[in-house]
Amino acid sequence: MLFRSDDLLTTEEIERLVKLFAKEGGVRKVRLTGGEPTVRKDLTDIVERISRIDGIEHVAMTTNGVALKSKLDALKRNGLKSINVSLDSLVKAKFEFMTRRDGLEKVLKSIDEAIRIGIETVKVNVVVVRGQNDDELLDFVQFAKEKPVNVRFIEYMPFNGNKWETRKMVSYAEMFDTIQKKYPSIARIPDETKSEVGKNFQIDDFQGTVSFVTSMTNHFCGGCNRLRILADGNLKVCLFGNAEVSLRDAMRVDNASDDDLKAIVEGAVKRKKAKHAGMENLAFMENRSMIRIGG
């Protein structure tokens, strides 16, 4: 079990925090991650409440996609605009080995359904690990050729529990070189904002696009404007940092006012470091596993 149910933020607590961030912090986009958001019975209600908050322009979600298909229509009707589906293999046996479940077909059907009903943006997150799925790099590129999706290749990052090793990390430069040899027309798409996380590329005659998230070899800390509220209500100002502060406890135990919460958040942001540690230091830093942080 990732979290006890009593530890999770309630629907009302989530709504309160998003209202505060929108009003006081100028937040315009909210992404629901996890653990896995589709396991929450109140997910559609959460999306509906967030999408109605003044100032919120975009509600997105990151999911493993296994239980997504049947929920998509209601989520879209209630304000969900984009999804990221985490998918590290297109090979059935390998998918089962990596995820410990038989769900590849369900994930692929969820992606197709999202496209069919007109979800604005459909992204596929692929964490590339040497010796595990790096041989599927071009298969995922082909996926972007055949479908109007953005396939995002993510450099393998050090987190608790993933047995990270430098040699397992396939760099952006290496991935790009492999793809460019097969598709020489690959060309950079200009960033829409300074806070863009991925380096985005288009290829001639492709329905979709490909991107690279280069957290390890070419960090984007200087343009990062993201804050994370974890499922249990802890605030993280940096994905790779291990400093957290509990907004849930501030609300439940300390009966914090909105001004109190604002002060807590501002204090955490002021303590944020200019950039995250290097790969080797991160590998030995105590931090949550990625599944507990959310993608």
Regions found by a protein language model. Name each.
Residues E36:
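Conserved G/P- and acidic residue-centered "switch" motifs that form tight phosphate/ATP-binding loops
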Residues K145-E146, Y156-F159, K163-G295:
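Auxiliary Fe-S-binding modules of radical SAM enzymes
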Residues M1-L2:
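Short, small-residue-biased leader/transition segments that mark boundaries at the very start
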Residues L8-T11, E15-R31, R40-I154:
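Radical SAM/AdoMet-radical enzyme domain recognition
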